Regions:
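Extended hydrophobic/Leu-rich segments
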Residues: 10-15, 40
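Extracytosolic ligand-binding ectodomains
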Residues: 29-39
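A generic helix-loop boundary/linker signal
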Residues: 1-2, 35, 153
Length: 183
């Protein structure tokens, strides 16, 4: 049973520790009833990553009556016809009660030549596990998942680089990482 409605609790999950930690703080309250939001791609967890600010509750933060172990993250050959990269991991309910976990998959580009977020959420999967139960989760990524918009070429492009795949329970609770070269 929930003690607080999910709608009410969601508000608190996105709260900064300090008002000055918010992206719009430097431009608030605007001028002549006009408020400009200048963070561009760097909204939410992307802003906090770039500014190296730890929010009160990170994007994806949640509570559970049990614990989960993430292990064996590894790159695997993609199975989907449009997939260009894939990886899998094992997740285990290491607690004493049934639980659900949202496994979040983030992608980083090592030494990117373009201005982009430090990491981007690309996939997620909710798993339900009995105590001691394990499941294998596979994430497949398409070219579009790894692309950025090139203003110069007016098209989506994949930057040739080392791509770091991270999985975790929230934007700052990263449990495992692995990498592959794409390009």
């Amino acid at each position: 049973p929930r003690l607080v409605s999910s709608a009410a609790s969601d508000v608190y999950k996105r709260q900064p520790k300090n008002l000055s930690d918010t992206p719009a703080y430097s431009t608030y309250p605007g001028k002549d009833l006009q408020m400009d939001y200048e963070e561009g791609l760097f909204i939410g967890y992307r802003w906090y990553d770039r500014e190296e600010i730890e929010p009160l509750f990170a994007f994806g933060h949640g509570l559970s009556y049990t614990t989960f172990d993430y292990s064996n993250l590894r790159a695997v050959p993609p199975k989907g016809t449009s997939s260009v990269a894939a990886f899998e991991l094992d997740i285990t309910n290491s607690g004493d009660v049934f639980g659900k976990e949202v496994v979040q998959s983030y992608v980083k580009v090592s030494e990117s030549k373009i201005d982009r977020p430090i990491k981007e959420l690309k996939k997620f999967e909710k798993v339900s596990l009995e105590p001691g139960e394990s499941k294998k989760i596979t994430f497949e990524l398409t070219e579009r998942d790894l692309s950025f918009w090139s203003e110069t070429n007016q098209s989506w492009q994949v930057e040739p680089a080392e791509y770091i795949f991270e999985v975790g329970a929230s934007a700052i609770d990263i449990r495992e990482s692995t990498s592959v070269w794409l390009g």
